[in-house]
């Protein structure tokens, strides 16, 4: 049997935030959600989260995940004290206890499995993850014998100068035999510089303690402040981008771009500098994104390009060109072979194939037919101050520059709207609609003004 306990009670004072530390976000997910994700495939018998500071907020943040149990730690007196709170909760439990930190979000599922497997194959009372760090400051040091059995772990603040030179560190990830641990947990001491109960003090009291040294120390990077949060974001982005580059995606300047774990890319996609993808983005083959794009929860068809633009919660077809400086807002669908040009905003609209909206337009709550040409400066006036109204434009129609279509309105097929028109009534197929004042010219007007 397996129980998982996640330590999530701390305040995170160094974060300088109103949120508990485990609710800080890393690439769209909280630190706690990331830890839970890393162990979701273990199918544990018990999943326990030890909460304390702002416990209600922490509970609410994961209420969409079933099967979680919460254990309160008040006050917070160290990792050993946190795990002591499990003694009544796990009474009668026979099996292994995996202890994870809520502020170590980059741990891979494979690494956790490897630790559990080593723990069980070695029949140890406790197994820990260890890592060699070039700068081990802040981490407890692991001291083991020639057989790889741990003799002791000394917290950084309690190390002598000689002990501090050891760069084999405790990653803070443990797998215990619960029966062995529960017998000694009540007896750990707070005789240390922090007057806290350290979980590491149980190591020397257990008959057999082993460690698994991991190759990628970045996996066990802990987060205590915003600098470390930014560093973990960088590590996560490197991990994601390395994976997709192996699948054929080109990043021109990877360090300037960010993507989410939900993103999916086809072959021969190119991502230019300063391009950021959030949420679930599906990008088909041969797309060219950027530079300077923000794309969120979007589907982009093959051979499409987006430059200097924002796309949110929208679908874009094949062979579509967007930008520069376009804003594609939610619930927009742009079909194949369309062109959306500079300073165009589209919201909650359907743009049929082969249509062009090239310059300086606002299209909202609209249905645009096939092969429509929207002239520069055309807008759909969709809001009457209370409600939004729909504009429908039939296939093969075109609007002249600086036109206003006052919704609700239906423009038929093969219609031409004269430049500068404000159209407020439906227009039938094959018509020309003009709604503007007659031009008046006053000869010699300038001379009269000057009195000559």
Curated annotation (Swiss-Prot):
Top-rank taxon: Bacteria
Keyword Cell wall biogenesis/degradation belongs to the record: yes
GO BP term, example: lipid A biosynthetic process
Region (Pyrophosphorylase): 1-226
Gene3D superfamilies assigned to the protein according to its UniProt record, in alphabetical order: Hexapeptide repeat proteins, Spore Coat Polysaccharide Biosynthesis Protein SpsA, Chain A
Residues given in the record as Mg(2+) binding sites: 103, 224
Record field: transmembrane: none
GO terms assigned for molecular function: glucosamine-1-phosphate N-acetyltransferase activity; magnesium ion binding; structural constituent of carboxysome shell; UDP-N-acetylglucosamine diphosphorylase activity
The keyword Ribosomal protein is annotated on this UniProt entry: no
Compartment list: Cytoplasm
Name of the protein described by the UniProt record: Bifunctional protein GlmU
Annotated source species: Prochlorococcus marinus (strain SARG / CCMP1375 / SS120)
